[in-house]
Structures are given as C-alpha cells and as structure tokens.
Amino acid sequence: ILLDRSKLPFEKNAAQVKELTKIAHACGMGVEAELGHVAMGDEGVFTRPDEAKAFVEETGVDALAVAIGTAHGAYKDTPKLQFDLLEQLRDTVPVPLVLHGGSGTGDENLKKACSMGINKLNVAYELYTGAIDGYKAYEASLDEKWRTWAPYDLYDKMQAGIKAVAE
C-alpha cells in the first residue's frame, strides 16, 4: 500500500503513516510511504537523511519513497538528481528506497539511481502518455460506425501504446 502524506508536516505525516502501517501489517500487507515531497514541477522538498531514518523507525514502513530531485508529470528539461543525497539516504535508511517521478528522468539517471540504491521506480506519466497515444490511433481508425467498438478493443490499443513506451 502506498501512503502518501508527504504534504503534511513531518510529525503529522509520521503519526498517520504509523497508524495506517499497523493496520496494513495486521492484514499482511506491506507499506510504502513518501517523505520529502515529489511535487508537480519545481516545488519539491528534498528528503533529509536524519528525518528519513527517524520516520522509518517511528512508522515501521517497509519501503520509503524519497525526494532527490524528481517531480510527478512532465519535465521541461531533464532533472538534475541529487545523487549525493541518494547516497546518504541509502547509507542511513534501513528499508528499500523508491523513486517517484521517474518518467522523463532519462535512462542514465534511472540506471545510476538504481545502481546507488533505488529499489523501485515509478514511471506512470510515460505509460499514461503511451495509453493516450494508443487511444488516439484507435480513434483515428474508426469510421461512422464508431458506436460498434468494443471496450476490449480500446484496451488492447491502449495497452499497445504502453508496450511501445516500455520498449
């Protein structure tokens, strides 16, 4: 389960995540939480290693999404990830690290991040774009009998767009 309370102050984030983590663990589920704020655009707040360690110890989460310079959505330019910060986080935090906002970050940045301790990448924006491209191609192929299309046809076309992004 992803618990994102990263917009909240540290104390409130930790308290809510701790309570929800207890419930999730009681049901046999793992928990990923976010500390620092992976924003839309340039408003992000970097994850501090000392806070990250305290957060993990206090909440009992199984994985931690860290903010090292990525953002949700599209980028104007390739982001400059704070690899020195990632190294500190990797050496400080005792659970797997997650990188949100990986779409558009660039293959080299992602490879380096993974080699330095990122265990999971989120790249949804590129996949959404691929799905929309697949939909647009399907829509363009429809004639006046468009009402006869089947939902699974649309799904197949959107999935093809996602696969094209993954390749």
Feature-to-residue mapping (PLM):
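Alpha/beta enzyme core
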Residues: 1-95, 107-116, 123, 135-137, ...
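C-terminal alpha-helical cap/extension of soluble enzyme domains
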Residues: 106-167
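Thr-Gly-centered strand-to-loop micro-motif
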Residues: 99-101
